Amino acid sequence: MAEEEPKKVTETVSEPTPTPEVPVEKPAAAADVAPQEKPVAPPPVLPSPAPAEEKQEDSKAIVPVVPKEVEEEKKEGSVNRDAVLARVETEKRMSLIKAWEEAEKCKVENKAEKKLSSIGSWENNKKAAVEAELKKMEEQLEKKKAEYVEQMKNKIAQIHKEAEEKRAMIEAKRGEEILKAEELAAKYRATGTAPKKLFGCM
């Protein structure tokens, strides 16, 4: 069992490691550990350090280049992220400002519409009141006009009546004077005397 274990160890160590120093030191440690532990445990333990060292050596060679790129990418990523966050904040702020502006405009429009509506109703009420007053005045004027027309008609009738009375008086007086003239003429004929006044009409 002990012979088989070192063989396995040497085989596994010789394959992955190119340098002779590493396999020489490791088998001794493996030989010390092997009798104490189970035979299955050593093989996975021994090959793992060699690749780790290779990886460390490889990483040591690559370390100066990779971190710079990563740092640059991180810087660029952080700058881009900051720019994106700033743009998002700006867009958010602009959208809030736009929403506020729209709300204020809507509020102003509603307020103006309300005032315009109240002015329109006020105008209509005032116009209706004035038109009602005008109609009332027209009715009063029509009533007064009818009264005045009636009064004028009465006056005209009175004037006509007075004129007729005057005409009748004149006609009566004329008839009386004609009778008087006829009587005097008959008297003058009977007496044979001439009238003192001739051509009284002239």
Swiss-Prot record:
Chain segments carrying region Disordered: 1-79
Bias (Pro residues): 40-50
Induction of synthesis: Induced by mannitol and NaCl.
Gene Ontology, cellular component aspect: plastid
Keyword Hydrolase: no
Biased composition (Basic and acidic residues): 1-10, 68-79
Keyword annotations: Coiled coil
Cited Pfam families: Remorin_C, Remorin_N
Biased segments, Low complexity type: 25-39
InterPro entries: Remorin_C, Remorin_N
Gene Ontology process terms (BP): response to mannitol; response to salt stress
Residue ranges that the Swiss-Prot or TrEMBL entry lists as coiled coil: 123-169
Coiled coil recorded as keyword: yes
Family: Belongs to the remorin family.
The protein's name in its UniProt record: Remorin 1.4
Originating species: Arabidopsis thaliana
Lineage: Eukaryota, Viridiplantae, Streptophyta, Embryophyta, Tracheophyta
Gene name linked to the record: REM1.4
